[in-house]
Amino acid sequence: MLIFLVHVRDPQFYALPAKTRAKNGRVRVMGFPPIGIMSLSAVLKRAGHDCVMFDQANPDTPNDVIIEAINRRRPALVGLSFLSTTSYPYAKILARQIRAGNSQVKLAFGGVFASLNASLVKLQCPEVDFVCRGDGEQLILDLVERLDDPTEVAGVTWAKDGKVIQNPNRVMERNLDQWPFPDRESLELDFVESMPLDVPAVLSMERFTTMQTSRGCPWPCVFCDIPIFNEGKWRARSPQHVVAELKHLEEHGYGSVYFVDDHFLLQPKRIDAICNGITQERLSIQWGIEGRVDSVAQHLFPAMAKAHCRTVMFGIESGSQKILDRLQKEQTLEEVETAVKNAKRAGIEIVHGFFTVGNPDETVEDMKATFDFASKLPLDTFGFNRLCVYRGTPLWQEYVKRGLVNEATDWYKYFKCSEIDPTCLPGEVINRVRQEGLRRLFLYKIFHYPVQTYRLLRRFLRFMPVR
């Protein structure tokens, strides 16, 4: 059976370098690879199906090219994968264009936003036959065998006789080792490693990809939908399976990989085993992770650095304990400072801090405290983004109860908190304080961490011509 998989992107979250094509002729993209559809492609191919992937970041495959390929090759199923509410409008447009030119092909939506809003999505976008909820590997294998009658396919939302039907949820799969490595070679794109800065900066020109070694995060941060999507559970692949994929990547020419786990630092024994496996296999591939500052695995930072972990990114959010508590981060400023310093002392090359501004109940003094706090941390890079609220997060539910958002009419939207929450500072104040704070922060870094700042600028400037 022939299946098409399309990764739908919000144009804000990727960029094309000035030199768009690599020497091998493949298009280069500054952004993360679509690991979701790559994983599904590998599963489908192992089961004997044919699979073709498209990524909307590729300028060679705009919507009309994808639609022409669908009409010419007549796949049995076209799956559109998208991450969040920001890419949902683009998925709707493509689905309606596909349906306008082909009344027979089966269409499916998948991804976090689709999973959390399945019935509403099906009602708003009737052109789509199936909305798939949760993990997709076994779901898509079951679905392709029952396209005409998905009654028995757990995790699917569909319609019959004009009525939306929500099949029971799938049992969350804990054995992640059973799935093959993602199909990274069939999509003719090369991804450029870049930092998540307001102005994306190229980090290296090594062949780059992403991996997922675990799924989920059990912490209750009010702005995050991950605990709801993963039912508050954390699931992980075995160290042996992770090291085997790293070895596979190095053998195929990859020099750098970023783990897109929501919280890599959760299980120290597993981390230790992964580092030992990398050392025993004598791998040289570099890798990066995200994690919480209160992780008990910080004593393993030296082992991670020895195993070529180059980047650690922390969700710091604020330099005000009041705001951290308001966001239910369950971390302290002391833990932030300890984690960042431990990572740098261990030899982690790049330590990044994610911060939010425009938070509920945040004052100008809180914002200034955040920039002052950031200036004293030995961070290599940092980002300060306006806090947004999405359906599926605890903060959204709070705003529904407070009458700030309408569940019936706003479910597919997202808002900057400062646009709707009267306890937030006005947007113009946030932008002014942020601009002033960044100026002070950069000056502080230059004078107090000159070597660190010089090394970072040298790294970025080295690759600026490709942008």
PLM regions: where:
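C-terminal accessory regions of radical SAM enzymes
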Residues: L2-A22, T157-K160, V164-Q166, I350, ...
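Hydrophobic/aromatic residues located in beta-strands of well-ordered beta-sheets
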Residues: I3, L107, V153-A154, V257, ...
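Short catalytic helix/loop segments, enriched in acidic residues and glycine
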Residues: T20-S41
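Glycine-rich beta-alpha loop elements in corrinoid/cobalamin-binding modules
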Residues: G36, L40-N175, R386-C388, G392
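Short, solvent-exposed turn/loop segments enriched in Gly/Ser/Thr/Pro and often Arg
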Residues: A57, V260-Q267, R292-V293, T356-D361, ...
